[in-house]
């Protein structure tokens, strides 16, 4: 089975970005995407990992990669942010537990400086997990995620190639929303790159995935707007179980 883990809401940019091989000039690190703290502004870096992560960013280290070919700045990694994904939690855990087998998950709040609309929130919950073991592969990851959605009763889920700075190969799972005639991204997934795992001393493949809980519920409960979860509509709340049951047994 899986073990549940938790992590801090206020996080070092080091864990939120740098340890995940996300370059310091990446657009996601800009203030229009990420909430940075004014006070306190900086935190304490894990000194045993700083030089290893720095080398991977600048030259690729001994991974065979060329890195990002820029001058990595300690002061950027020291900044404190409201975590933008719970991958910061799983990468912290992986740094402390580099040996297999590992099967952990997290369901927790994250924050993004985004324009709010029918499928985006500035504060929401993310479902996150990793599996690390000898011989695991991308096919195992696809099977795990497919089984997860199947047991929830979601139909019309498919996988398509994607890109994330910290996984390769990468994919996303999407579900078709008939009422909106569109595909909605549910989860991003992939295998952690060597530039992520090697500085942590991890020697085996790590399957990783993460996606919004509210988006999953949006698909499960036939909602038109993700903001409905925070409207406190008692009539809708009382009817949730019926909506889900109808969808689970194929009545919708």
Specify the residue positions occupied by each region the protein language model found.
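TRNA-recognition modules of translation machinery and tRNA-sensing kinases, especially anticodon-binding
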Residues: 1-252
